[in-house]
Amino acid sequence: LNAAEALVRWDHPTLGSIPPGDFIGLAEETGLIGPIGEFVLRQACWQACEWQRQGLEPIRVSVNLSVHQLRQGKLVSLVRQVLEESGLEPRYLELELTESQLLDSVEHIISTFQQLRELGVKLAIDDFGTGYSSLSYLKRFPVDYVKIDQAFIRGLGEGTEDAAITQAIIAM
């Protein structure tokens, strides 16, 4: 095990566990995405440090971002504060933004990502292949990882067109 991803679920009293795809849009519309995102970031960093305190090897913990969190302009200071408070080394934190979200506020995202990289945080583009970005567009973003969408990965062993596309991306 070399990495883990923090995933939030809404534990609804009557509907049970609700996946993020079913409530993140509402959280963004109502302004709750900021507090939810901060909670997830804090919990992920704390848990990664807790595992280290228990004697486990350090692992990278990944947290998904919403473009709304980036727009607020407080993300870099929040990440810096959480890293200091938790004691997690920045290299063990990875922040992810989906490819489709990169199309919004491009220059602001690039600037924020550059500042986060200066802190030592790892950055990733998630769900690559689901948006309409060209590779020349994506290379503008200072990221450490590009995570290919699982829809492409599923067809890898079957000789499908998805497999050909995925292999071409990996070869680059």
Q: Where are the regions a protein language model picked out?
A:
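Catalytic-site-adjacent helices and loops of nucleotide signaling machinery
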Residues: 16-20, 29, 125-138, 162
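Conserved long alpha-helical elements within nucleotide-processing catalytic cores of c-di-GMP signaling
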Residues: 18-25, 34, 110, 114, ...
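The catalytic core of metal-dependent phosphodiesterases that act on cyclic dinucleotides
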Residues: 3, 7, 80-156, 170-172
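Cyclic nucleotide signaling catalytic output domains
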Residues: 22, 26, 43, 62-67, ...
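Catalytic strand-loop-helix junctions within cyclic-nucleotide turnover domains
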Residues: 11-15, 69-71, 156-157
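Catalytic core of bacterial c-di-GMP phosphodiesterases, primarily the EAL and HD-GYP domains
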Residues: 1-5, 30-108
